[in-house]
């Protein structure tokens, strides 16, 4: 395995969206939701937020930005729009485009809020795709030369709807960016739970929306994976090297230019964990 020495790519993001439908009128909220997320990421401190949007005023189906920025390295990729088990239709990025990516250890986490892109059972009937878009993302390349994504979120059903996907997307990102939930699957679960508040017992064509979305949306990859929102910063520990180890306690401060909260400090004695503690919420002392 190769180890990444330059993690600055985690400061970069890519937002892809398509306002499209096979019958008019075209929806407008996929791009609107993505612009909202762009503002959130900008406020959070992302260095680069590239976009590839398809809409009525800009109908460029084959947008090279997707492949170029993916190859350059981005931490997260978010999609809202129109697609199926093959991939994203507008702008166009299918399974075949994944195989054309450069091998790269700078693998993003992909959030694909669009129909069927996570359909891992597409070939269950015997005549579907052997791998859906999400499976191709998470198994692309080889062990030594991977390409695609570290993990992806997507639905396994073809009949998701824009208004529900938007809510799921927005709440997930609120939980991640506001620091309440750092892991992938728990953040997705929070998005699913938000549908209860927004839509209650709503049924569409006899289908309970909340139950449906809880059932079809999932993670392909490690569900406990923390979503790194930017390059990890270097922590500084101010420790008195001459401090007597006969004392009943040892005090130190942990900072990264500003004091850090909830840092786990571990005291080792004879190669064994002797004591652990979190930095205090008041002055970040442990």
Predicted features along the sequence, with ranges:
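Conserved small/polar residues in nucleotide/adenosyl-binding loops
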Residues: 276-282
């Amino acid at each position: 395995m190769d180890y990444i020495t330059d993690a600055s790519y985690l400061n970069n993001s890519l937002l892809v969206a398509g306002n499209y439908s096979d019958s008019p009128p075209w929806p407008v909220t996929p791009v609107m939701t993505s612009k909202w997320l762009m503002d959130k990421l900008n406020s959070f401190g992302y260095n680069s937020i590239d976009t590839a949007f398809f809409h009525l005023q800009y109908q460029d189906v084959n947008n090279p930005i997707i492949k170029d920025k993916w190859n350059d390295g981005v931490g997260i990729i978010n999609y809202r729009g129109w697609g199926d088990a093959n991939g994203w239709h507008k702008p166009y990025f299918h399974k075949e485009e994944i195989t054309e990516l450069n091998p790269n250890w700078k693998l993003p986490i992909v959030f694909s809020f669009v129909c069927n892109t996570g359909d891992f059972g597409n070939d269950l009937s015997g005549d579907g795709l052997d791998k859906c878009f999400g499976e191709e993302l998470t198994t692309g390349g080889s062990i030594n030369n991977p390409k695609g994504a570290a993990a992806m979120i997507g639905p396994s059903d073809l009949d998701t709807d824009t208004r529900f996907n938007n809510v799921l997307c927005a709440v997930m990102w609120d939980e991640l960016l506001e620091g309440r939930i750092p892991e992938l699957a728990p953040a997705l679960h929070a998005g699913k739970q938000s549908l209860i508040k927004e839509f209650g017992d709503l049924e569409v064509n006899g289908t309970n929306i909340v139950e449906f979305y809880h059932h079809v949306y999932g993670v392909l990859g490690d569900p406990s994976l923390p979503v790194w929102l930017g390059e990890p910063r270097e922590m500084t520990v101010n420790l008195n090297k001459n401090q007597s180890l006969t004392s009943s306690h040892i005090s130190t401060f942990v900072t990264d230019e500003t004091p850090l909260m909830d840092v786990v400090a571990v005291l080792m004695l004879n190669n064994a964990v002797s004591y652990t503690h979190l930095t205090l919420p008041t002055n970040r002392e442990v």
